[in-house]
Amino acid sequence: MIASIKGTVLHKDINFAIIDNNGLGYRVFLRPDLLASLKDGVTVQFFTHEYLRENERELYGFESIGELKLFWKLMTVSGVGPKMALHLLGLGYEKLRKAIDTENLAIISSISGVGKKTAQKIILELRGKLKSDIA
């Protein structure tokens, strides 16, 4: 498993960046706000989660271990896959934690692809469990 990557931003696309690491280009999916802040040619480092599918491997990048741990917790919720978890992280750790702890369906379901039922599952399964992993 690839636990982290350090390299140069080679290219940015809609939901991923290609990071050049010693001549190999890795496609790394990132939060939309983080992706928007990257500049081509800049050296970056991310903690990563390698997601294996039938025919494909995907890398998801995070600025901190805390953010990665929150990603893992989100992925334990039935119906939440890696792309949805990444978009939820775009809310920011504190805003997401507060929305879950205060049962704020409106904020959680404001994320594209997150319906009311999924938001309710996220709240039910994660309420009170996010305080120790501050990003």
Positions of the model-derived regions?
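Short, acidic/hydrophobic/Gly-rich beta-strand patch recurrent on exposed beta strands
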Residues: 17-22, 88-89, 100
